[in-house]
Amino acid sequence: MDKPLNMALVGASGVVGQKILQLLQKKDIKIDNLFPLGKSTVGQTISFQNKDYIIGDLDSFDPKEANITIFSAGGSVAKKHAKKFVESGSYVIDLSSEFRYEDDIPLIIPEINGDILENLKEPTLIANPNCSTSQLLMVLKPIHERYGIEFLNIATYQAVSGTGKEAVEELRSQTYDNDSIESKVYPKPIAFNVIPQCDIFLDNAFTKEEMKLVWETKKILDPKIDVQATCARVPVFNGHSEAVFLKISNKASREDIIEAVQGTEGVSVMDNPDSLEYPTPYEQANDSEDVYVGRIRSQDIQGLSLIHI
């Protein structure tokens, strides 16, 4: 008889925490006991599977109550608490960047390297890649397997939902009241603008978000791939977009790439120039978990270009 699924969700009231609960409910995954946890939100009520839950205090919660725990409350919270949950017998999935680059902690995209999970013998801390990396590698894995990717140049156009509730509200308020714009979340106004900065700048003049794409692509897909990235924040509520140029080892046509990507779990191809069929955040990002890819083009230099949402 399977063990009951007792899940703790740290950051349950946030944008990501709420999305996790929506996905669990949509996929009809039965949670026997849910423990929503937080710090500043203790005492608030959330709803899940037709039941109301009171958010509990993370600091006083007994980790032994949970056999799986999801952290969606940022790196500092995960750093303080995640390993204590593992030591108490819980499998832990951390959505922050806190543990992604530690050699002994698996960085998992289930559709790509989920087989690693099958070999786990005991409760483990599992890192979740950056959202931009996950959608990128979902598309690139079948291409790399068939044709070998040597070089990537990525430009991201990232929605404000990736920053959190405050960013969503900032875009909404600036859009409605453009005369008195006040920026608290971002360094520049986000409404009617494009901000060529996601996360902090590092010593090499790249932002941390850009380097996440580099580090995580190499760790998950192939350390030999040369990766260049530019990340921008755009005035879109939901749905990150990425324009990708890749150089491959073996020449492939546009049709070859479409064939390679089609049928990949979690990926949908939308690419018909004649009927103006291509993905957009507005149409595809709100009601689906799939990655949508289009505008696929092949170049004579064994290069490919595409856009995905």
Predicted regions and their residues:
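N-terminal Rossmann-like NAD(P) cofactor-binding subdomain of oxidoreductases
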Residues: D2-I190, D226, E259, D271-I301
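Short amphipathic alpha-helices in soluble, non-transmembrane regions
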Residues: D256-T264
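Conserved glycine-rich beta-strand-loop-beta hairpin in the small C-terminal domain of fold type I
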Residues: N238-A243
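Glycine-rich beta-alpha junction loops
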Residues: S40-V42, C131-S132, T156-T163, V194-F201, ...
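Noncatalytic modules at the cell exterior or secretory-pathway interfaces
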Residues: G303-S305
